[in-house]
Every structure is written in structure tokens, then in C-alpha cells.
């Protein structure tokens, strides 16, 4: 039977519930347990797919093609379980399902209410998402006291009663601020946060106290006294220099022992040797490179969360400190390529819309002409094709129909038909809804032997995740190839371009898929590892 750990947050948002939850999950997995994780988002959007990156941050794409919260990226980086569409749902998704049932008449004329209909649907989805795992950690987004969170908190209150105290526990993250002028940490915000929880029938079993200073024994004892939580279950979690230290921090305070004892689970001790190796490689690099990341959402770096982490992982696997120089593509449009001088490699990530595209194209041209290693992802591949068409082939009006529908050389256009991961045919038009209509999820890609990308993967066939609705225009592809553009990867059916490379260049690879979604700190990712190796070679050549 599955045991549930419900995770809530109080006092302020952005305390790191996702990372703390994933770290505990990593320890439990290291003890031999089958672990999964869920994220419940209280916002009304059906999913984050159409939300602005400036508001929501990254949209993480699962293997089965769900557009989900970025916390699922943390989950997959910390545990081996692959997330699916069942591991993340929103208020909007819940209401959409309940209202569809009401329209069908499934409720037989009953008055639809938050309790029981909405809460029952939330509980059903939690149980479904947990599957057959030994332990499921269920993170509720937002902060206790938010009006949007109330149905979710009520649902987990009910579920705790239904499954019993031996199968459910509540872990609450709070802020314990350090007052420098007083030289002490303050526990009152935590006390009030727990009071808020208890007022709706939820008693925490574990408190994770977030602070920029260690929470001393006397403060933890005081918190335990006023919150009715066991003293050993009051955990101090201060800021660390790498998030991959957190499993060891929680383990050292006995959190996993407390959970295992509480649930009556029989399992081995935690083997955290893999995480020790990750931390050692992260904190003790032997080399250093600087890579320019040219994007359009630089005001909120969470928009590139998985990509930034993937670059860190590549640094770990290469024992190299990767310094990312974040450059807004609009700044290149205004200030020129001087912003790129001195870097060891250039990375252009995905994005949507016309703003900043010309700056990305300029960055591609700089990388190609100056033989600087280049990695383009999604839009980063499309702008590489546009740049090649303009500056190598002389098609000065070359563009994507996303940006210019009147272009005389639309080298990138809307995909109107493709096969999804199950083999079903998907059809789209310009009039299709934006939400959930892209080519999403894991797809096969066939790599050309002898190419740079094949050298990285050392495989003929790979599977990577996608999120796009535009592709290289097959009608103009023969002319692009004839002019020297190397097509080194195609979709499983051969219909779509997946990877392009520049010839006579030390390392220039651009892919339509998103490899960052499958990179992990313990395993890295072959494409990013190859990219950092190329950057390191460039750095050593300059030296």
C-alpha cells in the first residue's frame, strides 16, 4: 500500500518545497523504496502551457507529452522515476473534468459543490498519480492561507483520515528568519503558520525550517513545543552552495529514519554515495569555461531552469566549472556582438514570438563565422537554419512563418501533420488553439553516423522530448542541403528535421528537441557533455 507525504509551505512562497521534497524522495529511493512525486497547482489555468515564462518560469515537458510545472524537473533530477501527466494537475484541470462530467449528466442532477465533488476529484487524481509506489510525496503549490489552496488542503485532510495515520503524514516548510541586529532566529512566523494549518484540521508531522542561518537546538525545541511536533522532526535547512547537498543534510538530521519508522517500512539504510560524488565534482572542478546563453526571458532565469541545471550537470561530468554569461538577445540587436567576445561557446535556447529573434540570428552568425562552439535548442535550431539561408545561401528574406508570413523563403514553417509517440496522426492548422496543440513529448530521432551528434550519443536511434509547432520547411530542404547544411538527425518516420550541423566547424550542433528535460546530476546528458567538452577545447586553444 502506498504511503503519502503531503508537503505544504507557509509564511512566504519560494521556500523550495520542490527541492526539499525531491531531496527526501532521493533519500527514500536510496533506501531501496519505490518513490514517486506529485505537484498540485492551485491556479485556474488548465496547464502552464500557455502561461508567460516571465510569470510561471519554465514549462517542463514529461515523457508522455504533458506540459507541467518546473518542479517536475526537480523531481526527475533527484529520483529515477519518470514523471507523467498524472504527476501534475491544476485547479483548472480539476474543474474542467468535473464540469465535463456535469454536462454529461454523470452526477444525476446533483448540485455540484467544492465538497464533495471537487475534493473527491482531487483525491482521485492523487491516488491515481501515486500508482503502486511505496511512498508518494504530494506537494501542494502556493502558501497556506491562500484562498486558491483551500480545496487542495481540504482534500488532503480528508485523505489523511481515510488512509489513516500509518499511511499519511504532513511535512510543512516554513521560514525562520534571522534578525541580524538581534543576532537570533525568530520562530513566531513558524508558530503562526502552523496555527493556520491547524485551524483547517491539519497537524504537521514534520517541520522543515528554512533559514539563511542554522536553526539552533533551543529554537527547534521552542518550535516543537508550540507546534505540537516531535523535536526530532523539526529539521533545520539552511542555504547551501549546491542543492545536491540537501539529501545529505536531511539524512544527517534523521528525517528519512523518522519517515520510515512512522510508516513501519522495512528497508535498507540510505546509500548516498552517488550524491557524494556529484557534490565533490560540483565543488572541486579541474577546469573552467565561459558560455554565452543568448535568450529572451533573461529577467526570470527560472524560464530556463532545466537548461541551466543541464549545463551544471555537464560541468559535473567534465569536472569543469561552467560560467554562464546570460545575454538578452535584444541587447545583441542594440549593442552588437561585442557582448559575445571572449566566450568559449554559445548556447541559444528555445522561445516563442518575434521579439529578440534577430539578436539570436546574429549570435548564430557570430558562432558560425568565428568557429565558436554552438548549441541551438528548439528555436535555437530554427534560427540556425534561417541564418544559414540568409548568409550562406544569400536568401536575405529567409525567415520562419511564425515571424513573417510573407517571406519569399520560409525555411521554417508550421507543422500541419505528424505522428505522436503512440503512432496516432496529429493535425494542426493556423486556427488551432494554442494550449496543448504542439508536438509534445518523447519522439524517436534517427542520427547520421559520423556526425557530431552521433559522436555524442554513440547511438543510431535516440528518444528526446519535444515542444514545438514549427519545423524546417521540407520544400526548401533540398536546396539547403545542396548549399552545405548538414542534416544529422531526422524524426523516426524521416519526415521532420531534428538536428542540423554546420560543416567545416569544430562543433556546431542545433536540435529541435529539448535535451535538457532528460539531463540529471548523476548521469548528465551526452549532448551537453559534448558541448562543454567542445567549449573546453576552445578555451584551451585560446590559452
UniProtKB/Swiss-Prot annotation:
Please state what class of enzyme this protein is: ligase
Has keyword Disulfide bond?
no
Q: Which top-level group of life is the source organism from?
A: Bacteria
**Chain positions recorded as UTP binding sites:** 13, 186-191, 222
Where does the chain bind CTP?
13, 146-148, 186-191, 222
Disulphide bridges, residue numbers: none
Give an example GO molecular function: metal ion binding
Q: Which Pfam families match?
A: CTP_synth_N (PF06418), GATase (PF00117)
InterPro entries documented for this protein: Class_I_gatase-like (IPR029062), CTP_synthase (IPR004468), CTP_synthase_N (IPR017456), GATASE (IPR017926), GATase1_CTP_Synthase (IPR033828), P-loop_NTPase (IPR027417)
CDD domains registered for this protein in UniProt: CTPS_N, GATase1_CTP_Synthase
Q: What is its EC number?
A: 6.3.4.2
Q: Which GO terms describe its cellular component?
A: cytosol
Function according to Swiss-Prot or TrEMBL: Catalyzes the ATP-dependent amination of UTP to CTP with either L-glutamine or ammonia as the source of nitrogen. Regulates intracellular CTP levels through interactions with the four ribonucleotide triphosphates.
* Protein name per its UniProtKB record: CTP synthase
- Native organism: Pseudomonas fluorescens (strain ATCC BAA-477 / NRRL B-23932 / Pf-5)
| Source taxonomy | Bacteria, Pseudomonadati, Pseudomonadota, Gammaproteobacteria, Pseudomonadales
